[in-house]
Regions:
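N-proximal low-complexity "stem/linker" segments adjacent to membrane-targeting elements
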Residues: 1-28
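Cell-envelope/extracellular polymer assembly enzymes that use nucleotide-activated donors
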Residues: 4-7, 35, 168
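A conserved acidic beta->alpha catalytic loop
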Residues: 32, 40-49, 89, 93
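Glycine-rich, basic loop-to-helix element that forms the pyrophosphate-binding segment
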Residues: 47, 63-80
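Short aromatic/hydrophobic "clamp" motif used to bind/position activated sugar donors
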Residues: 85
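Conserved donor NDP-sugar-binding/catalytic core segment of glycosyltransferases
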Residues: 93, 97-125
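Conserved nucleotide-sugar donor-binding catalytic segment
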Residues: 115, 122-211, 216
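Membrane-proximal basic amphipathic "stem/tether" segments
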Residues: 217-274
């Protein structure tokens, strides 16, 4: 299986400062059995012109209004013919020029194959094994995740969600549909984005909680909360104050600062503990 066709999908909107480095990163890959798809949401900042400059490196692209990131990702998927899809959005870059060659040389057979992600010059691994605990606490990094095209076409991203549809897809595919999974110790991508806004993150957290409540019985959900975080006097206090909007925002912003200072080392450690 050393001639896998890899569909790389980039979605963007008014990303003229980031889109070129992403396209260039894809074009510079030594592995050439790539299908590159770019979905632009009708940008007005010059992004379209940059995409046109790289037309020879892109198999399909379009610039037109869409309904947001997940409709755009689904649109890109609908044009994919590869064995696997990977979503490298504007600003994301591959870790090295031979990343895709290394992935194909690893002989991927599983439905979902995950490598590692570079954040703030630190390599953050995806987990070796996936259980519900992963999705209660976090998710897999989509920039380092290769998904069977047939799988994502069967279960497309939920376009009613604004921030958590990729989490939902991975959770349902791996936990409820028992999709096969493998972690490979290969850094796949570099993530340099600033992350979601406070409002978008809040929406994503709400969507995750609503989906967990919808698909898990209450007592099982409570067990996972206890299993993942433990019930301590401190946690009980946090649960109470997190219900106060101003306090919740302070906690969220403080956590963001701490994680940046530590260069995501805490996140890396809990992955190792799984």
């Amino acid at each position: 299986m050393r001639s896998e066709l890899i569909s790389v999908i980039t979605v963007c909107y008014n990303a003229s400062k980031e889109i070129e480095k992403t396209i260039s990163s894809v074009a510079s890959q030594t592995y050439k059995n790539i299908e590159y798809i770019v979905i632009d949401g009708g940008s007005t900042d010059g992004s379209k012109g940059i995409i046109e400059e790289y037309n020879k490196n892109i198999d399909y692209w379009v610039s037109e209004p869409d309904g947001g990131i997940y409709p755009a990702m689904n649109k890109g998927t609908s044009h994919a013919h590869g064995d696997y899809c990977i979503y490298m959005n504007s600003g994301d870059t591959f870790y090295s020029k031979d990343v895709l060659q290394k992935v194909v040389d690893s002989n991927p057979k599983e439905d979902i194959v995950c490598g590692d992600l570079c954040i703030c010059d630190n390599i953050i691994p995806n987990p070796d094994e996936v259980t519900m605990k992963v999705f209660y606490r976090s998710t897999l990094y989509h920039q380092a995740t290769f998904i069977r095209t047939a799988l994502i076409k069967t279960y497309p991203y939920d376009e009613s969600m604004r921030s958590a549809a990729d989490w939902k897809f991975l959770m349902h595919s791996l936990i409820f549909h028992n999709a096969s999974y493998r972690h490979i110790n290969i850094p796949i991508a570099v993530f340099e984005g600033g992350g979601l806004s406070d409002n978008s993150s809040s929406i994503g957290n709400k969507e995750v909680e609503e989906e967990l409540q919808r698909c898990l019985p209450k007592r099982i959900l409570e067990d996972y909360r206890d299993y993942c975080y433990g019930v301590t006097p401190f946690r009980q206090m946090v649960n109470k104050v997190e219900g106060i909007p101003p306090v919740r925002k302070i906690i969220y912003n403080t956590n963001r600062i701490v994680l940046k200072v530590l260069n995501m080392k805490l996140h890396s450690q809990w992955i190792k503990d799984l």
